[in-house]
A protein has these predicted regions:
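RNA-contacting regions in translation and RNA-metabolism proteins
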Residues: 1-41, 51-53, 58-82
Length: 82
């Protein structure tokens, strides 16, 4: 499931090298934390949240096959100063 999220998000964003997905396992729930650059957050969320909702729908369908519950959270990275 982690690979699925990375594959989809890297295809959408301008900075695919900055996409990072962390998996936190619970008893029956898996939480995925998605980190992208601040410039890419809008692209991942999409107009009226349609893009992130579509990704979450795919994630939930995949998790349901394994009798699990999955959640996807977007964590914004801080701007890196040079």
């Amino acid at each position: 499931m982690k690979d699925l999220i990375e594959y989809i998000v890297k295809a959408i964003v301008d900075f695919p090298e900055n996409v990072n997905v962390t998996q936190i396992d619970g008893e029956s729930t898996i939480v995925f934390e998605l980190r992208v650059r601040q410039e890419d957050v809008g692209k991942v969320i999409g107009k009226k949240g349609r893009t992130i909702n579509a990704i979450r729908t795919l994630l939930n369908a995949t998790a349901a096959k394994a009798n699990l519950r999955a959640m996807l959270e977007i964590v914004e990275e801080e701007e890196q100063s040079s």
